[in-house]
Amino acid sequence: MKRRRPLQLELRSQGRGGSRAGAGRKKARGSGVPHLRRPALAARHPVHVTMKLRAGLPSLRGDRSFPVVRGALKAGRRRLGIRLVHYSVQSNHLHLVVEAADASALGQGIKGLAVRLARRLNALFGTKGAVFPDRFHAHVLRSPSEVRNALGYVVHNFAHHLALDGYVVPRGTRDLLSSAAWLTAPPPETAPVVAAESWLLREGWKRARPNARS
């Protein structure tokens, strides 16, 4: 089956003035994903979003960092056009599974979340500027198997990284810096996530075979 091109959206605002040749900050070597036209996004399709931390900043999984990240996620879990349903916090990136009405709402919602995170993390780190300076990467999930695979990847991502580093990860290990606790149970009001509204995230993914290819 032909692979779908992932959705890649811009976090940064365009700034003042119109489009000008050579205007704006030059692209740094090794910076994030290239800018692509936004494909259509239907509200029934959840999205797996990855946000990469600026190089040189402390780990997001630190004892001081994670509570700040969790607080920002909770504050933005149902604001600015997105609903945060699942997440995992890694040392230098975030994985999110969100619902949004359309591509515009997704872009505005993730941009707002990035601003919220930057404000709080800069205060903690004593730094300035964008904390997630690159365009975020987003993959639209259109089938039960895609959603199941994405959820497994997100909530087990830390175990995946540990295994790549040679550590033995016991089966069933749950990452406490993720939404794994609410994978099959409704989140409480104190959680940094909200209950899913889309059929794919509520019920559809449960009907897919484990490790099924989309």
Region locations from a protein language model:
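Short Pro-Cys-Gly-centered "Cys-loop" motif that presents a nucleophilic cysteine in a tight turn
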Residues: 1-47, 51-91, 99-214
